[in-house]
Amino acid sequence: MQIPFLDVGGDGPILHFAHPNAYPPECFRQFLAPLSEQYHVFAGIQRPLWANQKPEELADWQVLVDDMICLFEQQGWQNVIGVGHSLGAAVTMLTAVRHPEFFSKLALLDPVFLAPSLLQAAAQIPDAATQNPYVQGALNRRNLWTDKKAAFTHYRRKRVFNRWSDAALWDYVNNAIVPDGSGDVTLRYKREWEARFYSLLLQQGGAVWEALPDVRQPTLAVRALETDTLIPEGWQLWQELQPGATFIEAPDVSHLLIMERPLAMAQLVLDWLAEG
């Protein structure tokens, strides 16, 4: 099948954005718009957003790497600038290792590089991959509202969205929430998919540490100072495994940094790219 993608627009060299778990790429309008002023921006659409896909049939999260490889081969893309956030950053890195010709540079923003101690602890606990708070939080997430305004009001009260502007939150609501066919609205990226990726990453997340020493592209490595994903142990290990990368910690942001400060994060990427 043809892998779907979003054409954000713009002129210049191709830049591919890989979106995170649970967030469709259209949500990141404010982050992608400045990038499209200097680059032609595309964003692959991950399989949870395709029709007729079943999360319970997913056995390996790296199927997203296979999908990205397929997309690049179908479009004939090479020497692309790869930008990824969270799960999308991990997928971009692994794709770059398997097909170095696809990418000229990488910008990895708070990637899901789970620290070895977390992976080891999960391996020692029965049902850790299903009982983890992130997995349970995803499965218990509210997924039905009367309309988009009700969804916006619900999210506006949530502490996790405190730093999001109203415009950023509306970008999420308008692009991540869709009619359910019965008069209400629901999540476009199903919560079962979100939970499935959390579960598989706890079981299989060590793959990123094995691959990092093989990255050959110039890399911008960004960690949100208030992240709960890329903890200090993982950040230090990344620096040891890829010492040639540019490492930057972004202040006053959490894991959702490109929604909290989209323009500042876009400028950070643009400045690094401009340095050559």
Where do the PLM segments sit?
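Conserved hydrolase catalytic core segment
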Residues: 78-121
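Conserved HGGG/HGGXW glycine-rich cap/lid loop of the alpha/beta-hydrolase fold
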Residues: 7-57
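The conserved beta1-alpha1 loop
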Residues: 16-20, 85, 223
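Alpha/beta-hydrolase
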Residues: 142-220
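Catalytic histidine-centered segment of alpha/beta-hydrolase-like enzymes
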Residues: 250-262
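Conserved loop-alpha-helix segment in the C-terminal half of the alpha/beta-hydrolase fold
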Residues: 209-253
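Post-His helix in hydrolase/transferase enzymes
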Residues: 259-271
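Active-site loop/oxyanion-hole signature of alpha/beta-hydrolase fold enzymes
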Residues: 42-83, 122, 267
